[in-house]
Amino acid sequence: MKTEPDRTPLPDGLGILARLDGGGPLPELTAALNALCEEAGEQRERTVVALRCTPPPPGARAWPGDVSIHEVNRWERAVRRLERLDNVTVAAAQGVCGGPVLDLLLAADFRIGTPDLKLVLPVNQGQFWPGMTLYRLVRHIGPARARRLVLWASDIPLPDAVELGIVDQISDDVTGAVRDAALLRGGPPDGEVGIRRRLLEEAASAEYQDAFGAHLAACDRELRRLRDSGPGPSAGTAAGGAGAAG
């Protein structure tokens, strides 16, 4: 059993690119994802973590397959670990994908799909798999649209995935798109990515006054970071990134 993803450095030291088999057994995928997160955590410099998910064999659909609840628990924890990395994460998918690929796309910061991408939903005997995909779908697209997918859909065609925000960019050059995304979306240094993710997540449910304190603390941290870095490249890069985002 292969327990590590096929990992290679991104060009120009931008980060790590890992290829994951979208049709692999759940324990193997879990081990591969944990190994990738471990490597990302050991990097001393700012690192983008990019995942390139390959489609399963034609006709494969059942997810997660014949597994134990303990294996499901380990998989969900690995996806959450990816989601909470202090790195910008990019996920790319191609072909007809399902199961783990939808989990990884929803957990990533930026998502790339090829023109032939179709996301097959994790439906077994007519019932949507009740894993944390449900939770992420609701958080990502809202309960009404998530309900339509869960109760009546069997797949998400690429145009729908783009409209729902599950795919951010379409490209038939996955390698180039991943590199460009890593170059443009390297994000803030150190633990700043995680802070911004938490602020975004909490904004969906927190009251204004509750959120205000967390945002003010983040602003104070950012002012100190910019002051420490001075008017050099770091501050300029941060300002340029903010301008591009706007």
Please report, for each region that a protein language model flagged, where it lies by residue.
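Intrinsically disordered, low-complexity segments enriched in small/flexible residues
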Residues: 1-7, 19-25, 50, 198-246
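Conserved CoA-thioester-binding segment of acyl-CoA-metabolizing enzymes
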Residues: 1-54
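Terminal peptide-recognition signature
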Residues: 33, 105, 161, 196
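An acidic, glycine-rich surface segment that forms the CoA-thioester-binding/catalytic face
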Residues: 38, 44-45, 54-95, 134
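Glycine-rich beta-to-alpha active-site loop
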Residues: 74-126
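Well-ordered beta-strand positions
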Residues: 109-110, 148, 152-154, 166-169
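C-terminal long alpha-helix characteristic of the crotonase
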Residues: 112-114, 167-213
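Hydrophobic, secondary-structure "cap" segments at the distal end of domains
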Residues: 134-144
